[in-house]
A protein has these predicted regions:
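PLP-dependent class I/II
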Residues: 1-113
């Protein structure tokens, strides 16, 4: 099965594009440092572009819903990846997006203390 022609044309233009690994590394270090300083337990990434963060009460689905409803923060519960009790946060986003997410993570964490 071949991908549609439009997809093939788009991929052809992207063939030489390389990810900005230095930016991803900076985001990883920032997110890990800030979340652990807030009191979150994080599993250090070992080559992936996402960070697993343990939710304080173990209910990753409820945490994700609360983050969206109370702080307009979209996070992925790791139950979707057969790893309940964690969030799976991708850090291959803009540095600004990481910075804008931190106050919400801080506010949510404070509610658990």
């Amino acid at each position: 099965v071949c991908p549609p022609t439009l997809v093939q044309l788009a991929l052809q233009r992207c063939a030489d594009v390389r990810p900005d690994l230095a930016a991803y590394d900076a985001n990883r270090r920032l997110l890990y440092r800030e979340l652990t300083q807030m009191g979150y337990e994080c599993i250090p990434p070992q080559g992936a572009f996402y960070l697993f963060v343990r939710v304080p009460d173990g209910d990753d689905v409820a945490f994700s819903q609360r983050a969206k409803l109370e702080h307009d923060l979209l996070v992925v519960p790791s139950t979707a990846f057969h790893c309940p009790g964690f969030l799976r946060l991708s850090y291959c986003v803009s540095h600004d997006m990481i910075l804008r997410s931190l106050p919400a993570f801080r506010a949510i964490r404070e509610k658990y203390q």
